Regions:
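Short, solvent-exposed coil/turn linker segments
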Residues: 44, 103, 172-175, 179-189, ...
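Oxyanion-binding "anion nests"
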Residues: 98-99, 179-226
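Short N-terminal helix-initiation segments at or just after the protein's N-terminus
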Residues: 58, 161-173, 191-205, 235-242
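Loop-centered beta-sheet repeat module
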Residues: 133, 137-184
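Generic intrinsically disordered, low-complexity segments enriched for polar/acidic and small residues
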Residues: 3, 75, 156-159, 174, ...
Length: 319
């Protein structure tokens, strides 16, 4: 059997789409909301089976990965998150790059020699890597309108991944991938797919509500926002953090969204002018992790909000 384990955001979706356009296969899809990255524990694979893992951290899957490799399962991995210690095993192949201007879809694009570049461009835009997206798009000779369409596609696919549970999402990420699968041409998906229209409309509604929320604390070096326990807030949290980062490139941003379970889910974006420190900040808190430019905390107790805010402004002090 073959399994595709992928992050449910734009980067995971577009990475998988590129791979399966290049290497068609019938596989079992294993995915979830964007923050559900401990996916290998959900896979019951046997000797000779194959797993393709995309845009999920090795570190968060270390124990099940070791067990699967010892059982004789072959695992290929593409990712841009901090991997921790990588296993050395003949059944394991990894392409990992944690540079701040790289996403998993760009790594897959590199692996495939640009065979399906437009999807990688969309994913890079979705990950708020605008400069990297434009560099990748340069050989495609796209118009400004086409480049804008890929940006909107990436942002909408990314938006669908955010939520406390699958019930918050417009589409289960596996179903959204199945909607992408018939389309080698990203522009055809944009023009024809009803799923894209649903995401575009939902994105506009949810972002309008998010932009109406005032900052809880704002300084020249950073801003903290607290969003309510509402499905729209959970869907908008990550994409609104990206939006704020783009609008204020010298400022860091943190969005704390109340979960139905009572804790807060945190999204952090380093300043675009200095894409570093987000992962180190979040890793100081249990359930925290991510990338240098963009990271998060899955469970922040309300009592620890003052500790987090203090650590945030210490990580991003005023000049």
């Amino acid at each position: 059997m073959r399994f595709d384990a992928f992050n449910g955001d734009a980067d995971g979706l577009c990475a998988l789409h590129q791979m399966r356009l290049a290497e068609p296969a019938e596989t079992t899809l294993v995915t979830g909301v964007k923050r559900d990255i401990g996916l290998l524990k959900k896979i019951d694979a046997q000797a000779g089976d194959e797993i393709l893992a995309l845009d999920i951290a090795v570190e968060k899957n270390a124990a099940p990965l070791a067990a699967l490799l010892e059982k004789g399962v072959k695992v290929r991995w593409f990712d841009h998150h901090n991997p921790g210690e990588l296993p050395i095993h003949p059944n394991f192949q990894a392409t990992i790059d944690t540079a701040a201007d790289v996403c998993t879809s760009l790594l897959v694009d590199r692996h495939l020699d640009g065979a399906h570049r437009a999807w990688a461009v969309a994913a890079a835009f979705g990950d708020n890597l605008h400069d990297a997206a434009r560099r990748a798009a340069a050989p495609l000779d796209l118009s400004d309108e086409q480049l804008g369409a890929l940006r909107e596609l990436g942002e909408c696919l990314n938006y669908n991944g955010y939520g406390d549970s699958l019930e918050d999402l417009h589409f289960h990420p596996a179903d959204l991938y199945r909607a992408l699968r018939p389309y080698a041409d990203a522009f055809a998906f944009i023009a024809e797919a009803p799923q894209f229209r649903t995401l575009r409309e939902g994105y506009a509604r949810d972002m309008a509500r998010a932009r109406a929320v005032p900052a809880a604390e704002i300084r020249p070096s950073g801003a903290v926002y607290i969003l309510p326990d509402e499905a729209w807030a959970r869907r908008a949290s990550g994409v609104y953090a990206n939006d704020l980062a783009s609008a204020h490139p010298t400022r860091a941003h943190a969005l704390l969204t109340r979960s139905p379970k009572g804790h807060f889910v945190v999204s952090v974006r380093a300043p675009l002018a200095n894409r570093t420190g987000a992962d180190e900040l979040c890793r100081r808190f249990e359930t925290g992790g991510g990338r240098k430019a963009a990271a998060g905390i899955n469970v922040l107790p309300e009592a620890r909000i003052p500790d987090f805010v203090a650590a945030f402004f210490k990580a991003y002090p005023e000049a």
